[in-house]
Amino acid sequence: MARKRGSSSRKQKKVGFDYGVVHIKSTFNNTIITLTDKDGNTLTWASGGTVGFEGTRKGTPYAAQLAADKVAREALRMGIKKVDILVKGPGPGREPAIRTLQGAGLEINQIKDVTPIPFNGCRPKKRRRV
């Protein structure tokens, strides 16, 4: 029988930051939101799957909203008040995640789009015909 894990003490030690970076990776299938310190060390994260959605519902704007709310609450609990936001990807969860972070009481310093764009790199997949 599997043993139930206790809560990690690692999160408790990280308290004391006042500034963080929120990375939002939004694809058509899911939205992953990660809170890091300025050096890039992960403090907490959430996604459409961790807030209780499965399958295609993970990619919805509502799932991104709930994931952003979870990250924002954890950030405020750690004492983080100011954040930079780095957004990557074309998914539908980009805007709701940013709005939720702003509405949760985090002060947003800057919002950057860091979606990777190839300078004519690999040949893309053939176009889908329906």
Swiss-Prot record:
GO BP annotation list: translation
InterPro entries with a match to the protein in the record: Ribosomal_uS11, Ribosomal_uS11_bac-type, Ribosomal_uS11_CS, Ribosomal_uS11_sf
Keyword Transferase among UniProt keywords: no
GO cellular component: ribonucleoprotein complex; ribosome
Listed Pfam families: Ribosomal_S11 (PF00411)
Molecular functions (GO terms): rRNA binding; structural constituent of ribosome
PROSITE patterns in the record: RIBOSOMAL_S11
Record keywords: Ribonucleoprotein, Ribosomal protein, RNA-binding, rRNA-binding
Function as written in the Swiss-Prot or TrEMBL entry: Located on the platform of the 30S subunit, it bridges several disparate RNA helices of the 16S rRNA. Forms part of the Shine-Dalgarno cleft in the 70S ribosome.
NCBIfam families: PRK05309.1, uS11_bact
Oligomeric form and interacting partners: Part of the 30S ribosomal subunit. Interacts with proteins S7 and S18. Binds to IF-3.
Entry similarity comment: Belongs to the universal ribosomal protein uS11 family.
Protein name in UniProt: Small ribosomal subunit protein uS11
Species of the source: Thermotoga petrophila (strain ATCC BAA-488 / DSM 13995 / JCM 10881 / RKU-1)
Gene (name only): rpsK
